[in-house]
Curated annotation (Swiss-Prot):
Any one GO biological process: mRNA catabolic process
Protein name: Ribonuclease Y
UniProt cross-references to InterPro entries, sorted A to Z: HD/PDEase_dom, HD_domain, HDIG_dom, KH_dom, KH_dom_type_1, KH_dom_type_1_sf, Ribonuclease_Y, RNase_Y_N
Cellular component terms per the entry's GO annotation: plasma membrane
Gene Ontology MF, one: RNA binding
Gene assigned in the entry: rny
Uppermost EC category: hydrolase
Length: 519
């Protein structure tokens, strides 16, 4: 390449560089101008938007200010109205207070006037009382001089006459009241009791716990006794029951205080006889199984009893105790059957009286629950039963009805009285209960002794198996009106001192005979 070409190349490069620079300058200036114009437009638009937003904010602020002003005006008017109402009420109260003050002032004035009048009358009465006391003293002195009696003697004589007259009038009043009450109560009670007895269809058969076990042959007695008596001793030790083997053919008698033990012994002995294997180890095993089976049976019996009566929600332990009542008797009456009968009678009578039938049945079913454990726990069975009912969550009215059905505590509710009536009705019906001859004779003697111990009684006779006592009185000592008082006193004393099933009728007879002789 020659020098000229190099020079031309350099010149061309310089011209190109200058041209490029100029073009770059022109383009940069153009871009800067466009950027300035864009910035001006953006600034203008931002200014316009700011002005528009400012106007909008101002308008919104004015609206809020207007709303707040209107709200404040409304609140002001409401408060002003409320203040006016309060002011009016305050004015009315002030007027009423002023009126009351005027009345109080008037009453105070009247009270002062009355007090002055009372003071004047009191002074007058004091003077008259002194005068009257003086006159009474003078009259007493004159009466003592005339009658020859002191004031104390005269007072005692007057009190005696007033007492006799009062007792006479009280007897007449009691006779009228009792007659009316008996007429009304007797009709209602007879209707309710008759309805209950007619609607209840229970068994009227006395049940007794069986204590005799039949044997297939006389040889079985020897096997039960065992070598040197070891089998019978093992059976008695395991069950707590005495086995009596005597000359009675093919029979073993079981004797024990606890009916449950007697039942376990009966079940075990029957199973041993049926099995044929009788030795001490086998006896202990069978007795243990019989105890478990009886436990299950007791619950089943209790559940069946609650189902038959229609009572639900009873604690499982109470159900078990109900089952134990199957093996408990009272005057030869089965206690479980008696409790179910009382529950049914309570339900029927409660329905007739408009009471809660279910609660009445519940109280009737549980009223003798204490008899299930009364041989293990000291105290009256009614109190024991109430404690058990309380322990297992029964309500207060049920607990009270149980505790009061023999009046160990006074009955304070209609339910308690209803259970008493049903209990008496179940126990007093013919054939329901029996008692020992010695107890029967002693009860009759005690009954006659109470009547004979009353003043004015000449003779007393217990009749109808002790369910009625007839009392003959001396007509010279007891009049017709006093007869009613005497009858009531005898009834109360019998209720207080004797224990008896059902009711005892007290009849007082006053007879006056006039005998003349024609000559």
């Amino acid at each position: 390449m020659g020098l000229i070409e190099i020079v031309l190349l350099l010149v061309g490069m310089a011209v190109g560089a200058a041209t490029g620079f100029i073009l770059h300058k022109i383009v940069s200036a153009k871009r800067l101008q466009d950027a300035r114009e864009l910035a001006d437009r953006i600034i203008e638009e931002a200014r316009k938007e700011a002005q528009a937003h400012k106007k909008e904010v101002l308008i919104q602020g004015q609206d809020e200010l207007f709303n707040q002003k209107r709200e404040l005006e409304r609140e002001f008017k409401e408060r002003e109205h409320e203040l006016k109402i309060r002011e009016r009420r305050l004015q009315e109260q002030t007027e009423r207070l002023e009126e009351k003050l005027e009345k109080l002032a008037q009453k105070e004035h009247d009270a002062l006037s009355v007090e002055k009048e009372l003071n004047r009358r009191e002074r007058t009465l004091g003077l008259k009382e002194e005068e009257l006391t003086q006159k009474i003293a003078e009259q007493d002195k004159k009466l003592q001089e005339i009658s020859g009696l002191t004031s104390e003697e005269a007072k005692a004589r007057i009190f005696s006459e007033v007492e006799a007259r009062t007792r006479h009038e009280a007897g007449k009043m009691i006779r009228v009241i009792e007659t009316e009450a008996k007429e009304t109560a007797s009709r209602s009670a007879q209707k309710i009791l008759a309805t209950a007895v007619q609607r209840y269809a229970g068994d009227f058969v006395n049940e007794q716990t069986v204590t005799a076990v039949s044997l297939p042959s006389e040889d079985m007695k020897g096997r039960i006794i065992g070598r040197e008596g070891r089998n019978i001793r093992a059976l008695e030790a395991a069950t707590g029951v005495d086995l009596i083997i005597d000359d009675t053919p093919e029979t073993v008698i079981l004797s024990a205080y606890s009916p449950l033990r007697r039942q376990i012994a009966k079940m075990a002995l029957e199973r041993l006889i049926s099995d044929g294997r009788i030795h001490p180890a086998r006896i202990e095993d069978i007795v243990r199984k019989c105890e478990q089976e009886l436990e299950v049976q007791l619950r089943e019996v209790g559940e069946q009893a609650t189902f038959d009566v229609g009572v639900h929600g009873i604690h499982p332990e109470i159900i078990k105790l109900l089952g134990q009542l199957k093996y408990r008797t009272s005057f030869s009456q089965n206690v479980l059957q008696h409790s179910m009968e009382v529950a049914s009678l309570c339900g029927i009578m409660a329905a007739e009286l408009g009471m809660d039938e279910k609660r009445a049945k519940r109280a009737g079913l549980l009223h003798d629950i204490g008899k299930a454990v009364d041989h293990d726990v000291e105290g009256p069975h009614a109190v024991i039963g109430a404690d058990l009912a309380k322990k297992y969550g029964e309500s207060k009215d049920i607990i009270h009805a149980i505790a009061a059905h023999h009046e160990d505590v006074p009955p304070k509710s209609a339910l308690a009285v209803l259970v008493q009536a049903a209990d008496s009705l179940s126990g007093a019906r013919p054939g329901a209960r029996k008692e020992l001859l010695e107890n029967y004779v002693k009860r009759l003697e005690d009954l006659e002794g109470i009547a004979n111990g009353m003043e004015g009684v000449s003779k007393a006779y217990a009749i109808q198996a002790g369910r009625e006592i007839r009392v003959l009185v001396n007509s010279d000592e007891v009049d017709d009106d006093t007869t009613y008082m005497l009858c009531k006193d005898i009834s109360e004393k019998i209720e207080k001192n004797l224990t008896y099933p059902g009711q005892i009728r007290v009849t007082v007879i006053r007879e006056r005979r006039a005998v003349g002789v024609a000559k």
